[in-house]
């Protein structure tokens, strides 16, 4: 695997803001991937199950850009924003592709993207900390976004995980005497998605895992000692 990266950092607004930019490219030869094949135990022409196998095949080329900034908007408020873009292309997947090309040579996956990696990602977080007599009232609102991914090398629609955005909100009081209490709402807008997807085959082309926890509201408290 060969990879190259270049970065740039600077500050602005008289040091109140920081900006980071990173660009990278890579090529990965003989990537290790899992492929599923049908199994006929009784040799009767009926598929009884499928089995996974690990192969080193093809080449993956990728390039991407990541940018982030942090801004102290005033003495109480800080804003963080980030954005990422990833473009990938896989070739030489004949040994694991179940889609035939024009001559039946299994090249229907040529040019596929790395299916488990979203093309676009983004995040934002707003923190507000307002001092009080014996502590501070702290508020945090954050959002993270991913574009669609999944579908295996073949791009099966059954295996796609759609784009989604998750938001969290926290409001609490932190005492100067080392204790705090906080109310929170995680997955504020009750978004649903999956952590990931197994690219199977045969009668079960997709298997999702890790369902997103629904909107969760609660209160937490804690104490620490110096």
Predicted features by range, described:
Residues 25-27, 49-153, 222-224:
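Gram-negative outer-membrane beta-barrel transporters
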Residues 27, 34, 144-152, 173-226:
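C-terminal beta-signal and adjacent terminal beta-strands/loops
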Residues 1-5, 60-68, 117-123, 164-168, ...:
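Transmembrane beta-barrel architecture of outer-membrane proteins
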